[in-house]
Amino acid sequence: MPVITLPDGSKREFAHAVSTLDVAADIGPGLAKACIAGRVNGELKDACDLIETDAELSIITAKDEEGVEILRHSCAHLLGHAIKQMWPETKMAIGPVIDNGFYYDIDLEHKLTQDDIEALEKRMLQLAKTNYDVVKRVVSWQEARDTFAARGEEYKIAILDENISKDATPALYHHEEYTDMCRGPHVPNMRFCQHFKLMSIAGAYWRGNSENKMLQRIYGTAWADKKALSTHLTRLEEAAKRDHRKIGKQLDLYHMQEEAPGMVFWHNDGWSIFLELERFIRRKLNQYTYQEVKGPLMMDRVLWERSGHWDKYSEAMFTTSSENREYAIKPMNCPGHVQIFNQGLKSYRDLPLRMAEFGCCHRNEPSGSLHGLMRVRGFTQDDAHIFCTDDQVQEEVSACIQMVYDTYSTFGFENIVVKLSTRPEKRIGDDAMWDRAEEALKQALRANNIEFTLLPGEGAFYGPKIEFTLHDCLDRAWQCGTVQLDYALPSRLGATYVAEDNSRQTPVMIHRAILGSLERFLGILIEEYAGRFPTWLAPMQVVVMNITDKQADYVQEIVKFFKEQGIRASFDLRNEKIGFKIREHTLRRVPYLLVVGDQEMENKEVAVRTRDGIDLGKMRLEDFATKIHQQISLRSLKLLEE
């Protein structure tokens, strides 16, 4: 007679084993109709799974984030159902949930076209509209293997052979004549899977290994209702307009080419923004009392072996050899910073020691994962490492948190999601050390009035971590900042300091990044601002245009004056109509467009308009310079009169 405890604390007693769907029906027919799955004693279960003992139960519906993830997963199975109807010879590989959607990797000789994708989507909708039940069967490993062997599903067999114990009892989900295998849970009926769209096709190697066969990957998105789907598709359209690769080309910021995959060729205007970002962070480093250092680009393999990176990270490292020695180009800055710390005897009075670097790092990312500035092989990390005592951890982490929020708010990012990853099952150190470390991070977050989500067991083996994820104007999430405690690397690389009692102690190391990769953050900014950078970041802040040749000398004097004032300015003296020139520089997203005619020249004035077409009227040159200087020094996100 299980007693079911609901989230509001109420209890319901049943005379026999019940499913989540049974409990929902006992509460009311509306909830039964909306029920997708259940969280039983903290674990997600299918709506049909029986609950035989007392349990705590949350009923999952499409209003829950988990419910939407489940229906997305079921849409992947629906896609498989449709594919097998249209191309029965298809071999199905994997179909997981991803952010905002799902994909399925398939082995099919026929190369899918956009017309095929549209036909597949239509077939999926036809199937879903029949509102068929999804039937779950838990079977033996052998029965599952026999089922897929009879269907010629070699990839499912490989998953069973290589990833699932023979003692396991896999779950098979039957969509009418189509059968798939999954941990689940899945929707009980396809009425939940009515609002989806297939988005694109790509290539993907089986198991992500380039030595394996290339499969076709079909991406889709799915939502709980028509409105949510429509909102998402509208956001995607806006994201396409803001694509940093497209805007980067339009504004001549950078380019990438086949001969240097994942490496950025910065053009003048793009490099101007990059340097401005660097200057901004450098000011923050001075404000928060950091040393700035510079380590070598590559170091001997021996050092990477001692740090532990060679065992865990060597496949992602670029290497080279010289004079019978093997070197690795650094994928991160931390081992180099420990080497700098180790030079000379350090006392407890020297701690905390905050060491920062704009480190040029390289990682051998798979070519298929490269994506403009967002995923590169060569990047600059605004990395820092703080060497401190246990007692200093909380205060130092608190300062890091303040620096993160101080920095992000300057760029207009106010919606920050914070997660704290705690001790994993396999870890160094005793529970007392982890208790102190985790509590220090929690207290630092609370002291700054930061709400955070705990991720139990998600920390690194060498210490807990705080992650900062910012949300942009399209509500996309970008994980940028991190604060990571490290109790292992200083010890591995022999870092010590002389404590107050003259004993040798190992410092705690705090890994800290604010922007992360400057390249990636610049890509985020391009899309956030749609190329319309605030004045302080804009590569060209002012362009001055003449109406006739008579004003040419005066225009050049104005630009010289601006440059002497530290304002990035240029002139346009082309023999073109002023309307044409205004339009061209508006498309270049230059914040301020200054026009000079005879009257302006005579009165030592400029006619000012913004890139948004707002006419600010005539101003004395010195007055305009004062206003724009104030805007730049405040790092205002708005233009004058906005």
UniProtKB/Swiss-Prot annotation:
It catalyses: tRNA(Thr) + L-threonine + ATP = L-threonyl-tRNA(Thr) + AMP + diphosphate + H(+). Residues 1-61 form the TGS domain. Zn(2+) binds at C334, H385, H511. Disulfide bonds: none annotated. Residues 243-534 are annotated as: Catalytic. Keywords: Aminoacyl-tRNA synthetase, ATP-binding, Cytoplasm, Ligase, Metal-binding, Nucleotide-binding, Protein biosynthesis, RNA-binding, tRNA-binding, Zinc. InterPro entries: aa-tRNA-synt_IIb, aa-tRNA-synth_II, aa-tRNA-synth_II/BPL/LPL, Anticodon-bd, Anticodon-bd_dom_sf, Beta-grasp_dom_sf, TGS, TGS-like. Binds 1 zinc ion per subunit. Its EC number is 6.1.1.3. One of its GO terms (cellular component) is cytosol. SMART domains: tRNA_SAD. The keyword Cytoplasm applies. GO terms for biological process: threonyl-tRNA aminoacylation. It is found in: Cytoplasm. GO terms for molecular function: ATP binding; metal ion binding; threonine-tRNA ligase activity; tRNA binding. Transmembrane segments: none annotated. Its cofactor is Zn(2+). NCBIfam families: thrS. PANTHER family: THREONINE--TRNA LIGASE, CHLOROPLASTIC_MITOCHONDRIAL 2, THREONINE-TRNA LIGASE. Homodimer. Belongs to the class-II aminoacyl-tRNA synthetase family. Catalyzes the attachment of threonine to tRNA(Thr) in a two-step reaction: L-threonine is first activated by ATP to form Thr-AMP and then transferred to the acceptor end of tRNA(Thr). Also edits incorrectly charged L-seryl-tRNA(Thr). This is Threonine--tRNA ligase. It comes from Shewanella putrefaciens (strain CN-32 / ATCC BAA-453).
